[in-house]
């Protein structure tokens, strides 16, 4: 009874290194296609809206790019990207920052502006998506 169990265990252990190396090789091949995220740090903080009372926002934003080369180019243009986003946020109202649908619309507009800016500077949009990691407003 012990012999079949020991034999099965030995067989499993002998095959384990080949399974382990196959699993390790897969991420390397997939790594070339994985997107890279560029966090805009520090978070964007400013005021928005018009009127006698100041309203503030804080936005933690990440930009999705295709690879590390694109990430390097995006990081180089980060001051210009931050400026575009700050100007966009300054134009917002309570309605455009208060509702989920409006925030999605703002996210899409922010992505479009970042892509246009990079298109002008690099000849390609480079950024495939823009994510709000955190968006806090104080109306």
Where do the PLM segments sit?
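Flexible, low-complexity charged segments
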Residues: 1-139
């Amino acid at each position: 009874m012990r012999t079949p169990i020991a034999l099965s265990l030995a067989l499993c252990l002998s095959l384990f290194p080949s399974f382990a190396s196959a699993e390790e090789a897969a991420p390397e091949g997939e790594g070339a296609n994985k997107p890279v995220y560029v966090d805009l740090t520090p978070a964007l903080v400013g005021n928005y809206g018009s009127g006698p009372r100041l309203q503030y926002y804080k936005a933690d934003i990440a930009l999705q790019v295709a690879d590390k080369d694109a990430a390097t180019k995006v990081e180089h243009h980060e001051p210009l990207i931050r400026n575009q986003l700050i100007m966009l946020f300054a134009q917002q109202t309570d309605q455009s920052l208060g509702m989920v649908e409006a925030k999605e619309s703002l996210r899409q507009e922010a992505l479009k502006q970042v892509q246009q800016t990079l298109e002008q500077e690099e000849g390609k949009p480079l950024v495939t998506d823009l994510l709000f990691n955190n968006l806090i407003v104080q109306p």
